[in-house]
Amino acid sequence: MSFLLHQSRFFTTVNHLQDLPATSQPEICFAGRSNAGKSTAINILCNQKRLAFASKTPGRTQHINYFSVGNADEPTAHLVDLPGYGYAEVPGAAKAHWEALLSAYLQSRSQLRGMILMMDSRRPLTDLDRRMIEWFVPTGKPIHTLLTKCDKLTRQESVNALRATQKGLAEYRAAGYRGELTAQLFSALKRIGIDEAHALIESWLIPEAKGETDTPQ
């Protein structure tokens, strides 16, 4: 099966807000804790082995990486890989820099259509995950959570993790958050949830495709 995301390539790296590219195409950002499997998920969704660099040193990536999607000369959209968060050994100044960069990007980027938030299915909705959601709340844009590494859980543990995450996300809806909040199980290793994630992401990038698939809950 062919997906738009399979036509992805590196575009640019950004380390300061003023360096964000002056593009008009829609963007989807990918966020998550260090070691939540974010780079691996991006690579499997784009059907490439090393599009997003998976560092063996958690917290090493402290900048924003852009990938163009579609035709190289006239991209349809951009995928935006945000720095992993939550690694204790990152120096305080670097951590403060990228937290400021993340929050400013999430709240001010008009091209942004939604966030794909990666959470380790064994430890969903940590305090830092909640902070990321709360940075995004003012935008009213959708957040879709991928509960990664679900292959490491039993079937019942996976069901429980998904239910607990959905319950936690429902708290934001009850508090008045206007954007869609959805979640699904995901495993790059066992290829669980890949087609489901593809369909949702492409419905954000190409609105007319939205009616062709049901949105995960």
UniProtKB/Swiss-Prot annotation:
Gene Ontology molecular functions: GTP binding; metal ion binding
Entry similarity comment: Belongs to the TRAFAC class TrmE-Era-EngA-EngB-Septin-like GTPase superfamily. EngB GTPase family.
Function: Necessary for normal cell division and for the maintenance of normal septation.
Keyword tags: Cell cycle, Cell division, GTP-binding, Magnesium, Metal-binding, Nucleotide-binding, Septation
CDD domains in the cross-refs: YihA_EngB
SUPFAM superfamilies per UniProt: P-loop containing nucleoside triphosphate hydrolases
Keyword GTP-binding set for record: yes
Signal peptide: none
Binding positions (GTP): 32-39, 59-63, 81-84, 148-151, 185-188
Organism: Paraburkholderia xenovorans (strain LB400)
Boundaries of every EngB-type G domain copy: 24-207
Needed cofactors: Mg(2+)
GO annotations of cellular component type: cytosol
Protein name, entry field: Probable GTP-binding protein EngB
HAMAP family attached to this UniProt entry: GTPase_EngB
Gene that this polypeptide is encoded by: engB
GO biological process per UniProt: division septum assembly
Superkingdom of the source species: Bacteria
Ligand binding (Mg(2+)): S39, T61
